[in-house]
């Protein structure tokens, strides 16, 4: 299969330039096409612009707050025999130590992304999705007090709504670690 595009999505985040330059360095010797979508206001509009920038049916979407692991395997491919879905990789949270899909790289399916207008609580989780236990990098959301609070607030709301044991354990870590 053709290597999937890599789309770096940014909109003025602290650390975006450093993470973009880092991504360019670690991908310079691989065949994947790497593009940047920058400055699109609105979450849904940014996701749509990122899908439109991709020339492959799925694309690795790297959010500006993620410092991508140089060990991430960009040869990874989605299971094309299954129903189309988004694939959520893992990221390490430097504040509470959790490792799961929060702030991680996502392999977005282009058609699903363009058909989603964000009517639910979470754009990615509104469509079919699967977790992939591959570490994509370190989430660097804790750059200032407001960004840290806003990111934590959004994630805690999602965890509160998802009444599963794993979400309850993650919620406890968010509420108790590093406070």
PLM region spans:
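N-terminal anchoring/stem segment of glycosyltransferases
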Residues: 1-53
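Active-site ExK catalytic segment of metal-dependent nucleases
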Residues: 8, 63-65, 90
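Short beta-strand-to-loop acidic/aromatic patch adjacent to the donor-nucleotide binding site
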Residues: 50, 57-69
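Short acidic, S/G/P-rich loop/turn micro-motifs used as interaction or catalytic elements
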Residues: 11-16, 66-69, 93-96, 112-115
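Acidic donor-diphosphate engagement hotspot in glycosyltransferases and nucleotidyltransferases
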Residues: 71-73
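Catalytic-site signature of metal-activated, phosphate-bearing donor transferases
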Residues: 1, 75-179
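Secondary-structure boundary/capping signal
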Residues: 31-35, 58, 121
């Amino acid at each position: 299969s053709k290597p999937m595009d890599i789309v770096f999505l940014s909109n003025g985040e602290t650390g975006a330039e450093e993470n973009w330059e880092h991504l360019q360095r670690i991908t310079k010797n691989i065949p994947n096409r790497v593009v940047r979508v920058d400055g699109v206001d609105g979450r849904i509009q940014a996701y749509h612009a990122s899908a439109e920038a991709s020339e492959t049916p799925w694309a690795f979407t790297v959010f500006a707050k993620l410092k991508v692991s140089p060990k991430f395997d960009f040869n990874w491919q989605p299971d094309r025999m299954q129903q189309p879905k988004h694939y959520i990789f893992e990221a390490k949270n430097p504040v509470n130590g959790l490792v799961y899909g929060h702030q991680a790289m996502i392999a977005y399916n282009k058609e699903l992304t363009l058909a989603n207008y964000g009517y639910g609580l979470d754009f990615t989780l509104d469509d079919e999705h699967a977790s992939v236990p591959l570490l994509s990098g370190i989430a660097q959301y804790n750059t200032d007090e407001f960004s840290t609070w806003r990111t934590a607030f959004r994630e805690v709301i999602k965890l509160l709504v998802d009444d599963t044991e794993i979400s309850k354990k993650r919620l406890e870590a968010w509420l108790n670690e590093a406070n």
